[in-house]
């Protein structure tokens, strides 16, 4: 063996700038309107945007949900109608019917093309209707649909209160950490004070990223076990409970697609970003907590045993996927984190397609992926940015992979060609963060493999056309 062969292989990056499929970022409304309970989302776009939202979330239309579509008409585009007056009419109606704490305007491709000055209109209208208006350009010019959330959170980061601002005591209590209130529910004041003393003395820490409430509670409790207090989450359950973010605060992201929010917090609010792998899978969650502990100068405890216990509980799933290969076509920017976890589970991954890669924000995750490949003794995956789907299909045939994680556009065509697929969008909506939710990831990944094994056992994988006897 030569010295060159002994050197560890590095990650191979490539950019194809090809045609790939993903949803439109305005789909972020689907989960954000449920997360921020006192909000109202107004999507300003054409009928096409309306059809997309109606198809994606049509079941909820009849429940009068807290989102709506402001359809641009010929008069808007030809500048015959006054944008301000039209938006004022709609926002007054929203205030009258729903009275939200915040209205979020979602800009679309059309508002970009006709140069509608939403940022200029919002402050005027806000002072008139006395409701905060947040403007987010979550349009189809982004790389992936999850970046819609990134745009909204970056806009909301500007609305987070500063600690230096003069705030009345009653307002402070109201704005207090909702998670802390939930965890302390039903406890006596003495117990709460005793619990507060369990925390280490460290700089304030704020998390950013929209997660379901049970997952937020789980991650907050995991950090609490290490003596780390989470001062707040962006977004909060209510707009009125946005966390205080001041200069020198530490911030940590929970999703790989939030690079714009991270940049806003660092540049505008002078926060310090904790660059950690993301808490997806037991390995990622442990690395995430350890990195936060090291930055805040806290000694982590019990994480190795916690991770080992989770891996032991996953053994029934690991037996199904160990030694198999997975191919990511690229859709939601979760690909690198999921690939790292699945490689740790014993799979191989020849290629990770990803619509957009921010190497600075995902730097820790990429290093962790490299280390995982070295530890597991498997080849490094090729990371293809902006992949060309036609070329990817050829490479899927070449590698003869066992599973392809793909967008909905390619799932059925690949299945028809005898290739096992899993919709990548399911990982966006499933609870995949933290120690305990690793089982949910493996449930999704193994489902197509288990289904096809069951069909083979039943003898349904071969359809025989019998001669019709007339």
UniProtKB/Swiss-Prot annotation:
Cofactor(s) demanded: [4Fe-4S] cluster
GO MF terms held by the record: 4 iron, 4 sulfur cluster binding; ATP binding; metal ion binding; oxidoreductase activity, acting on iron-sulfur proteins as donors; oxidoreductase activity, acting on the CH-CH group of donors, iron-sulfur protein as acceptor
This protein's UniProt keywords: 4Fe-4S, ATP-binding, Chlorophyll biosynthesis, Iron, Iron-sulfur, Metal-binding, Nucleotide-binding, Oxidoreductase, Photosynthesis
Catalytic activity, EC: 1.3.7.7
Return the broad EC class.
Answer: oxidoreductase
Q: Where does [4Fe-4S] cluster bind?
A: 24, 49, 109
Q: What are the recorded Gene Ontology BP terms?
A: light-independent chlorophyll biosynthetic process; photosynthesis, dark reaction
What binding details are noted for the cofactor? Binds 1 [4Fe-4S] cluster per heterodimer. The cluster is bound at the heterodimer interface by residues from both subunits.
Q: In which pathway does it act?
A: Porphyrin-containing compound metabolism; chlorophyll biosynthesis (light-independent)
Q: Which reaction does it catalyse?
A: chlorophyllide a + oxidized 2[4Fe-4S]-[ferredoxin] + 2 ADP + 2 phosphate = protochlorophyllide a + reduced 2[4Fe-4S]-[ferredoxin] + 2 ATP + 2 H2O
Q: Which family does it belong to?
A: Belongs to the BchN/ChlN family.
Under the heading PANTHER family, the entry gives:
LIGHT-INDEPENDENT PROTOCHLOROPHYLLIDE REDUCTASE SUBUNIT N
Which HAMAP family has this protein been placed in? ChlN_BchN
What does the record note on quaternary structure? Protochlorophyllide reductase is composed of three subunits; ChlL, ChlN and ChlB. Forms a heterotetramer of two ChlB and two ChlN subunits.
This molecule's function is given as: Component of the dark-operative protochlorophyllide reductase (DPOR) that uses Mg-ATP and reduced ferredoxin to reduce ring D of protochlorophyllide (Pchlide) to form chlorophyllide a (Chlide). This reaction is light-independent. The NB-protein (ChlN-ChlB) is the catalytic component of the complex.
Could you identify this protein by its name?
Light-independent protochlorophyllide reductase subunit N
Q: What is the lineage of its organism?
A: Bacteria, Bacillati, Cyanobacteriota, Cyanophyceae, Acaryochloridales
């Amino acid at each position: 063996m030569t010295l060159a062969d002994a050197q560890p292989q590095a990650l191979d990056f490539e950019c194809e700038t090809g045609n790939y499929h993903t949803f439109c970022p305005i789909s972020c409304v689907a989960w954000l309107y449920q997360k921020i309970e006192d909000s109202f989302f107004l999507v300003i776009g054409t009928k096409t945007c309306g059809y997309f939202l109606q198809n994606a979330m049509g079941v909820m239309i009849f429940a009068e949900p807290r989102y709506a579509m402001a359809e641009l008409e010929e008069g808007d585009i030809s500048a015959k109608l006054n944008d301000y007056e039209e938006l004022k009419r709609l926002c007054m109606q929203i205030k009258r019917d729903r009275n939200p704490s915040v209205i979020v305007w979602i800009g679309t491709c059309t508002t970009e093309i006709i140069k509608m000055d939403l940022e200029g209109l919002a402050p005027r209208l806000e002072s008139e209707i006395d409701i905060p208006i947040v403007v987010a350009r979550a349009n189809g010019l982004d790389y992936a649909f999850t970046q819609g959330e990134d745009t909204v959170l970056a806009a909301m980061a500007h609305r987070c209160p500063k600690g230096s601002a003069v705030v009345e005591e009653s307002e402070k209590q109201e704005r207090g950490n909702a998670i802390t209130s939930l965890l302390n529910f039903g406890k006596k004041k003495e117990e709460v004070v005793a619990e507060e003393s369990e925390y280490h003395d460290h700089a304030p820490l704020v998390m950013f990223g929209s997660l379901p409430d049970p997952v937020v509670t789980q991650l907050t409790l995991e950090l609490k076990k290490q003596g780390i207090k989470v001062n707040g989450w962006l977004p909060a359950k209510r707009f009125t409970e946005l966390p205080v973010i001041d200069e020198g605060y530490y911030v940590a992201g929970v999703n790989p697609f939030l690079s714009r929010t991270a940049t806003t917090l660092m540049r505008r609010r002078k926060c310090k970003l904790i660059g950690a792998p993301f808490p997806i899978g037991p390995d990622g969650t442990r690395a995430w907590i350890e990195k936060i502990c090291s930055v805040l100068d806290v000694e982590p405890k019990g994480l190795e045993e916690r991770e080992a216990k989770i891996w032991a509980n996953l053994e029934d799933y690991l037996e199904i996927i160990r030694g198999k290969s997975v191919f990511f076509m690229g859709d939601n920017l979760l690909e690198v984190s999921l690939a790292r976890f699945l490689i740790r589970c014993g799979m191989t991954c020849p290629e990770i397609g990803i619509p957009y890669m921010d190497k600075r924000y995902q730097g820790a995750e990429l290093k962790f992926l490299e280390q995982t490949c070295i530890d597991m003794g498997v080849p490094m995956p090729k990371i293809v940015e902006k992949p060309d789907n036609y070329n990817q299909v050829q490479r899927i045939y070449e590698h003869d992979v066992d599973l392809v994680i793909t967008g909905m556009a390619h799932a059925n065509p690949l299945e028809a060609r005898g290739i096992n697929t899993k919709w990548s969008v399911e990982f966006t909506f499933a609870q995949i963060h933290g120690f305990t939710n690793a089982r949910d990831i493996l449930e999704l990944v193994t489902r197509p493999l288990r289904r096809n094994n069951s069909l083979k056992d039943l003898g349904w994988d071969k359809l025989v056309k019998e001669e019709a006897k007339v």
